[in-house]
Amino acid sequence: MRSATKLIKNVNINRCVQSNVVRSTSRLINNNSINTVRQFTSSSSSSFTSLFNNNNVNNTNIKYQRFYSSANDVVIKVPSMGDSISEGTIVAWTKNVGDSVRVDEVVCSIETDKVTIDINAPVSGTIVELFAKEGENVTVGNDLYKIAKGEVAAAPKVEAPKAAEAPKAAAPTPAPKAAETPKAAPAPKSEAPTPAPKSTTTTTSTGPSETRVKMTRIRQRTAQRLKDSQNTAAMLTTFNELDMSALMNMRKTYKDEFEKKHGVKFGFMSAFVKASTIALKEQPIVNASVEENDIVYHNNVNINVAVSAPRGLVVPVIRNCENLSFADIEKEIGRLSGLARNDALAIEDSIGGTFTISNGGVFGSMFGTPIINPPQSAILGMHAIKDRPYVVNGQVVVRPIMYLALTYDHRIIDGREAVTFLKKIKDVLENPERILLEL
């Protein structure tokens, strides 16, 4: 009798345990926690066996855990793109969800105020999630995309299909002889219909009268900076004319030898950079900038050179011009221009300038007033070289003349300093030997 009673109690206990397990599992399923069910059932099977055998039912010992993602998933965040840049715009995703990606392969491109940056994959795997769409702004430090780590199989080699043999031409079938039937009589000619009179009504185009194109981020930033420059600086422009005869003769005489020795062509821009560097050293206020109530004098001469690029005008910087030779400057101009044309300029290539040179003459501009590139205090404008009448020793002669324009911030640069600066550039370029002698 006692054995039967004990058996009944054990059966009731086991039924209670089974009932609790079913209720717990149902609750988990209703909460869509499949991972929890797997964890619950797999890791606790041995515990339940011991629990059933020992008739020890205690629901408080059951723990639930929730898993949100795999340990193999890597979330890539928007990287730092420079001290002054906090956000950018997604211009293109080169990979979509489900695509395989290898280490260092480009996944997307982000356009900033200055340059476009390619974002590479840090690991190999599969793209499982994109956190932004093309055209959306993203902030530095925010989630950009997610990769499930894994080996990516090499692309199979595709053999070129063998050329199929041309089918043999079939033997020509002899044409059947024409049946001997009487020819039909020719139909009577009908009179040509009278042409309808042409309509005099003119049709108007029903197409759209305008086309809207969203400004690129770099164009928006350029517009904002130029407007800020106009609103902040007290801009004034002074002009002078430059006789290019001596510089053009020097270039004509030494250009082949220069290119043979240094591997780069002898251009006019390097001469203007050297002349500007000499003038900036003599007039350091032109190389300065305004920060609140302070005037900041820059000890190094870092000159931005305006370059036309596919996305618009960019101004990469040539650093430490005071330490560079003609050849060094030409090589740096060539390197930066190539990067600009290929839309491959880095952030470091465009920041830290103290003075800017813009050459509108390459587009045929005769005259213009450039706008200061903030936070700088001055900009030099070059223009087209044209043969013009010029007075030399009391005689009118024809000389290749370029008009120079210097726009400066009148808050810190006086007219005397600006005119003296521009005249120094004129004197150096009209007497190129001054560059060699640093006079």
From Swiss-Prot:
Its main location: mitochondrion. Keywords: Acyltransferase, Lipoyl, Mitochondrion, Transferase, Transit peptide, Tricarboxylic acid cycle. InterPro entries: 2-oxoA_DH_lipoyl-BS, 2-oxoacid_dehydrogenase, 2-oxoacid_DH_actylTfrase, Biotin_lipoyl, CAT-like_dom_sf, Single_hybrid_motif, SucB. It comes from the Eukaryota. The modification N6-lipoyllysine is found at K114. The active site is at H410, D414. Pathway: Amino-acid degradation; L-lysine degradation via saccharopine pathway; glutaryl-CoA from L-lysine: step 6/6. GO terms for biological process: L-lysine catabolic process to acetyl-CoA via saccharopine; tricarboxylic acid cycle. Residues 163-210 have a biased composition (Low complexity). Its cofactor is (R)-lipoate. PROSITE patterns: BIOTINYL_LIPOYL, LIPOYL. GO terms for molecular function: dihydrolipoyllysine-residue succinyltransferase activity. The 2-oxoglutarate dehydrogenase complex catalyzes the overall conversion of 2-oxoglutarate to succinyl-CoA and CO(2). It contains multiple copies of three enzymatic components: 2-oxoglutarate dehydrogenase (E1), dihydrolipoamide succinyltransferase (E2) and lipoamide dehydrogenase (E3). This is Dihydrolipoyllysine-residue succinyltransferase component of 2-oxoglutarate dehydrogenase complex, mitochondrial. It comes from Dictyostelium discoideum. The lineage of its organism: Eukaryota, Amoebozoa, Evosea, Eumycetozoa, Dictyostelia.
